[in-house]
Curated annotation (Swiss-Prot):
GO terms for cellular component: cytosolic large ribosomal subunit. This is Large ribosomal subunit protein uL11. NCBIfam families: L11_bact. It holds the Pfam family Ribosomal_L11_N. Part of the ribosomal stalk of the 50S ribosomal subunit. Interacts with L10 and the large rRNA to form the base of the stalk. L10 forms an elongated spine to which L12 dimers bind in a sequential fashion forming a multimeric L10(L12)X complex. Belongs to the universal ribosomal protein uL11 family. CDD domains: Ribosomal_L11. It comes from Corynebacterium glutamicum (strain R).
Amino acid sequence: MAPKKKKVTGLIKLQIQAGQANPAPPVGPALGAHGVNIMEFCKAYNAATENQRGNVVPVEITVYEDRSFDFKLKTPPAAKLLLKAAGLQKGSGVPHTQKVGKVSMAQVREIAETKKEDLNARDIDAAAKIIAGTARSMGITVEG
């Protein structure tokens, strides 16, 4: 007989610095509301993201009826990767009139490769167009 499936009671989506999850907000209150062991999650998340320090890594936490949980790591947000590639702190407040930085098409393709599994694109060219659109909306010029 197949094992019974656990009943899902919640899905939590968070964006946390890699290797730096702690019980303080926003992690603690979000998990505490679902009755999840916060320290257990923090230790597991920090261990899983240790090699990605310096990036914000989104995570999807599935909470089950017995208060156990699974989590799935996503790729860092395209905006954060673009800012890192352009060497900027933040995007433009008025992106269509004031450009704040430049990235090459090669950098855009590299970011698209990184994000490919999370993007809704069939091939790398379509993924690169999505990333280039994000860059334009941040006031970053794509060259090439």
